[in-house]
C-alpha cells in the first residue's frame, strides 16, 4: 500500500505538532477534610506536606500544618472555621509562612500575616521573610557594647540596656509595663534626630498580642502624636483574632525586625505580652491532642519562647554590625514570679525589670523594684559618666529599703541612720517620672548627679520634683554635652556642675 502525497503531508504535520507540543502542567497535592472544629481541621491525603507549611481551604481560608501524624495532618485555621465542611478539598501552597519586611512597613499597622489593617492601602516595595528562621550562630555575634536609651532615669541608671540585649519587663496587670515600652519608643525620636548615619538610627517594632483593639488604636494615636510612627511598625493580633494568629504574631514581628538587624541597622522589638502568646499556644496544643505538662502547657513551651528571644542579637562587624534588641513583657498573677512562664522567660533573657503593684499605688512610678531588677549585660554598654554617677545609687537605695523596714518600729534613730533615710527618700523621689515624658541621657546624668552628691538633702520632699524640672531647663547645653562626650567625670570636670547645682538648689532649700 502506497502513501499518497496527502497522507505523507499529514504525517509530517502531526509529527511537527507533537514535537512542538508543550503545556504547562500545574500539579497540586490536595487532601480532604476529615473533621473540623474549634479552629482545628484534620486533613487526609497530604502525604508530602512540611511542618509549618501554609495550606488553603476551598473556602479561601488559610491554615498552617502543625501536627504531622500517620493517618492525617492537624491544621490550625487562620480565621473562622465555619466555612469549612467535612469533605472539602485542601490544597498545599508549598511555602512556609512568610511575611513582608522592609522600610515600607514603617508607620503601618499590620496583622500577624503582614496584611495592613490601618486602612491606608497596600504596602510599598518590600521583600518577604520566613517567620521561623535559624538564629545567628556564636561566631556571627558580638558582645553587647552600645547603649539603648529608654529615657527613663530608673532604667538607664540602674538596669541599663544595650543594643542586642533581651530585657524582660515583668509585673502584675496595671503596673505600667506597656508604659515603659512606649516611653522607650518615644525616646528614640530625639535619639534618631541626632543620628548622623543610618547605623545610629533605631527602628522600633511593637507586637500587640491578645490586647483590646481600642488599646492598639490608643497606642497608634500616642505614637503619631509623638511623631514616633515614622520609625515604628505595629503588629497587632488582638483579643478577637484566632489563637493561631496570636501565636504567630511575635515571630512575624521578629522577622520584620531581623530585616534591619541583617542589613547593618538597629531595631528594637517589644512583645506585649508573651503570657498571652503562651496561652494561645496552649489552646492550640490541647486542641491538637498534644500531651499537657505543668499548668497544662505543652512540653515545648520553653522552646516556643527561647527560639523567639534568641533571634535578638548584636551582630559582629564582619556580618554588618546590626542589632535586634528585645523587650518581652510578661504578666504575673499576684506578683508570683516563680510561676512556669515567668521563670522560663527570666532564664532566657539577659535581665529583668520587675514592677510592683504596691510601689505603683504608693506613687512611685515607674514602679520598679530596684532589688529584684537586674541587667546582666547592659552595664558594659552604659555611658562612662552615667556609670560613675550611679555607682553608689543602687547600694544607697538597697540600704535605704533595709533601714526603712526597721525605722517604722522606733523613732529614736542615730544621725547616720537618719541621714540614710533622708537620702534614700530623696533618691526615690528623683527617680520618679511622669508617663510619656522620656528624658535625654545627658539631662538624666545631671539630675541623678545632683541627688547622689547631696544637693537635694536639705530640700523638702515636695519641692524635689520642681527642682528636678528646673535643672534641665536652666543648664547650659555645653555642660550637658561635656558630660556625655568627654568620657566621664574627674575632679576637674566636677567643678562646673557642682557650682551650677549648688546655685540652682538655693531657692528650694528650706530656710
From Swiss-Prot:
<keyword id="KW-0813">Transport</keyword>
<dbReference type="InterPro" id="IPR004100">
    <property type="entry name" value="ATPase_F1/V1/A1_a/bsu_N"/>
</dbReference>
<keyword id="KW-0547">Nucleotide-binding</keyword>
<dbReference type="Pfam" id="PF00006">
    <property type="entry name" value="ATP-synt_ab"/>
</dbReference>
<comment type="similarity">
    <text>Belongs to the ATPase alpha/beta chains family.</text>
</comment>
<feature type="binding site">
    <location>
        <begin position="171"/>
        <end position="178"/>
    </location>
    <ligand>
        <name>ATP</name>
    </ligand>
</feature>
<dbReference type="InterPro" id="IPR000194">
    <property type="entry name" value="ATPase_F1/V1/A1_a/bsu_nucl-bd"/>
</dbReference>
<comment type="subunit">
    <text>F-type ATPases have 2 components, CF(1) - the catalytic core - and CF(0) - the membrane proton channel. CF(1) has five subunits: alpha(3), beta(3), gamma(1), delta(1), epsilon(1). CF(0) has three main subunits: a, b and c.</text>
</comment>
<keyword id="KW-0496">Mitochondrion</keyword>
<dbReference type="InterPro" id="IPR020003">
    <property type="entry name" value="ATPase_a/bsu_AS"/>
</dbReference>
<keyword id="KW-0375">Hydrogen ion transport</keyword>
<keyword id="KW-0066">ATP synthesis</keyword>
<dbReference type="GO" id="GO:0046933">
    <property type="term" value="F:proton-transporting ATP synthase activity, rotational mechanism"/>
</dbReference>
<dbReference type="GO" id="GO:0005743">
    <property type="term" value="C:mitochondrial inner membrane"/>
</dbReference>
<dbReference type="InterPro" id="IPR027417">
    <property type="entry name" value="P-loop_NTPase"/>
</dbReference>
<dbReference type="InterPro" id="IPR033732">
    <property type="entry name" value="ATP_synth_F1_a_nt-bd_dom"/>
</dbReference>
<dbReference type="Pfam" id="PF00306">
    <property type="entry name" value="ATP-synt_ab_C"/>
</dbReference>
<dbReference type="GO" id="GO:0005524">
    <property type="term" value="F:ATP binding"/>
</dbReference>
<dbReference type="InterPro" id="IPR005294">
    <property type="entry name" value="ATP_synth_F1_asu"/>
</dbReference>
<keyword id="KW-0067">ATP-binding</keyword>
<keyword id="KW-0406">Ion transport</keyword>
<keyword id="KW-0999">Mitochondrion inner membrane</keyword>
<keyword id="KW-0139">CF(1)</keyword>
<dbReference type="GO" id="GO:0043531">
    <property type="term" value="F:ADP binding"/>
</dbReference>
<keyword id="KW-0472">Membrane</keyword>
<dbReference type="InterPro" id="IPR023366">
    <property type="entry name" value="ATP_synth_asu-like_sf"/>
</dbReference>
<dbReference type="Pfam" id="PF02874">
    <property type="entry name" value="ATP-synt_ab_N"/>
</dbReference>
<protein>
    <recommendedName>
        <fullName>ATP synthase subunit alpha, mitochondrial</fullName>
    </recommendedName>
</protein>
<dbReference type="InterPro" id="IPR036121">
    <property type="entry name" value="ATPase_F1/V1/A1_a/bsu_N_sf"/>
</dbReference>
<dbReference type="GO" id="GO:0045259">
    <property type="term" value="C:proton-transporting ATP synthase complex"/>
</dbReference>
<dbReference type="InterPro" id="IPR038376">
    <property type="entry name" value="ATP_synth_asu_C_sf"/>
</dbReference>
<feature type="site" description="Required for activity">
    <location>
        <position position="373"/>
    </location>
</feature>
<comment type="function">
    <text>Mitochondrial membrane ATP synthase (F(1)F(0) ATP synthase or Complex V) produces ATP from ADP in the presence of a proton gradient across the membrane which is generated by electron transport complexes of the respiratory chain. F-type ATPases consist of two structural domains, F(1) - containing the extramembraneous catalytic core, and F(0) - containing the membrane proton channel, linked together by a central stalk and a peripheral stalk. During catalysis, ATP synthesis in the catalytic domain of F(1) is coupled via a rotary mechanism of the central stalk subunits to proton translocation.</text>
</comment>
<dbReference type="InterPro" id="IPR000793">
    <property type="entry name" value="ATP_synth_asu_C"/>
</dbReference>
